[in-house]
């Protein structure tokens, strides 16, 4: 084995030289230079500095403006809430541990930090699944003129948290475990060992199949069918121009969110799967650290995409920030068809704003 395994950790560094130490008790500067830990701390500070206000503002603006409280927006707000959990209970801890060069808070806090990081990522993924299903039902109409209402949205939100907990909670109760990963200043599921006391192998297989592959199969199926339906509707002119434009705007926004998730999380999942299937092989600490920390940027892109692509929300946000006035003078009633209320329509024309 080219690493050092302890009771609650695995350091990707052989202890033949006697340098390897517990990541809960000693700085891990033998894994990487101190400036790299400082760079990670600065990066986490940036994510906190931007991620908290952007996600909090998304929630606050929606509460302030009743017109934004549409069924589809419930799912988008769910994403913002999950991101806030990651920022408050994950990023703050990781920033401090990076500043110290090791996980100073001990194994219990490592489990908590790993839990919230996994929970936030899974809520985001399953929220994208719900959005994909909603787009598929509304546009492809496999259930006829189905209306996606508040009850369905609430059920969708509850579903995302149930599935996320089904992924994030098992390591807390003995099925696998959370340990420091990479440069040992952030925590995640144990992909590194086959410790029989924790059944890591079965958990990792379960997580990759149920909580990674299945969601993406659903997402790609829904958007594949959706693309065909949109092309057919455009060719047959079955919907009004405003309806088609409205549905396309919302769909484009959700597709961008899916692409953003792929860009952020696929590198991490790929490296984790490689480590799991090549346990004991030689790899550097930064090999897992870079994709793990890059995945944390997912807390930023969803609200940014939402703000940039939804003119009605953008106008409401500007009005809130400017104490009830919009200096840009944009008329919300003439806003782009990006209004997310289109999710509640069937075959009736869609108001562009």
From Swiss-Prot:
TM spans (from-to): 37-61, 74-96, 111-133, 153-173, 203-224, 253-274, 287-308
Site residues (Plays an important role in the conformation switch to the active conformation), renumbered to this chain: 113
SUPFAM superfamilies: Family A G protein-coupled receptor-like
GO molecular function: 11-cis retinal binding; G protein-coupled photoreceptor activity
Protein's recorded name: Rhodopsin
Gene: RHO
One GO-annotated biological process of the protein: absorption of visible light
Annotated membrane topology: Multi-pass membrane protein
Classification via CDD domains: 7tmA_MWS_opsin
Organism, scientific name: Lethenteron camtschaticum
PTM annotation: Phosphorylated on some or all of the serine and threonine residues present in the C-terminal region. Contains one covalently linked retinal chromophore.
């Amino acid at each position: 084995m080219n690493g050092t395994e302890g009771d609650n950790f695995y350091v990707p560094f052989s202890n033949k030289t006697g340098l390897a130490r517990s990541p809960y008790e000693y700085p891990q500067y033998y894994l990487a230079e101190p400036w790299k830990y400082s760079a990670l701390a600065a990066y986490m500070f940036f994510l906190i500095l931007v991620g908290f206000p952007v996600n909090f503002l998304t929630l606050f603006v929606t509460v302030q403006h009743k017109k934004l409280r549409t069924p589809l927006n419930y799912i988008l707000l769910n994403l913002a809430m999950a991101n806030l959990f990651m920022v408050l209970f994950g990023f703050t801890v990781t920033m401090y541990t990076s500043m110290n060069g090791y996980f100073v808070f001990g194994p219990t806090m490592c489990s908590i930090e790993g839990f919230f990081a996994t929970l936030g990522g899974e809520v985001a993924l399953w929220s994208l699944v719900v959005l994909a299903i909603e787009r598929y039902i509304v546009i492809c109409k496999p259930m006829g003129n189905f209306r996606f209402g508040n009850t369905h949205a609430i059920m969708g939100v509850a579903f995302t948290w149930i599935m996320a907990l089904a992924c994030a909670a098992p390591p807390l109760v003995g099925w696998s475990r959370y340990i420091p990963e990479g440069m040992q200043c952030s925590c995640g599921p144990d992909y590194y060992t086959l410790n029989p006391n924790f059944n890591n192998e079965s958990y990792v297989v379960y997580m990759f199949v149920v909580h990674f592959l299945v969601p993406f199969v659903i997402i790609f199926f829904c958007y594949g069918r959706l693309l065909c339906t949109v092309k057919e509707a455009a060719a047959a002119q079955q919907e009004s121009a405003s309806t088609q434009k409205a549905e396309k705007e919302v769909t484009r926004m959700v597709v961008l969110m899916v692409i953003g998730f792929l860009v952020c999380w696929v590198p991490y999942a790929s490296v984790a799967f490689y480590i799991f299937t090549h346990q004991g092989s030689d790899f550097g600490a930064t090999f897992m650290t870079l994709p793990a920390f890059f995945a944390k940027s997912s807390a930023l892109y969803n609200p940014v995409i939402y703000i940039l692509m939804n003119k009605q929300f953008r106008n409401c946000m500007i009005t809130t920030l400017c104490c009830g006035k919009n200096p840009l003078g944009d008329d919300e009633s003439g806003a782009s068809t990006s209004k997310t209320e289109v999710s509640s329509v069937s075959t009736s024309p869609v108001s562009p704003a």
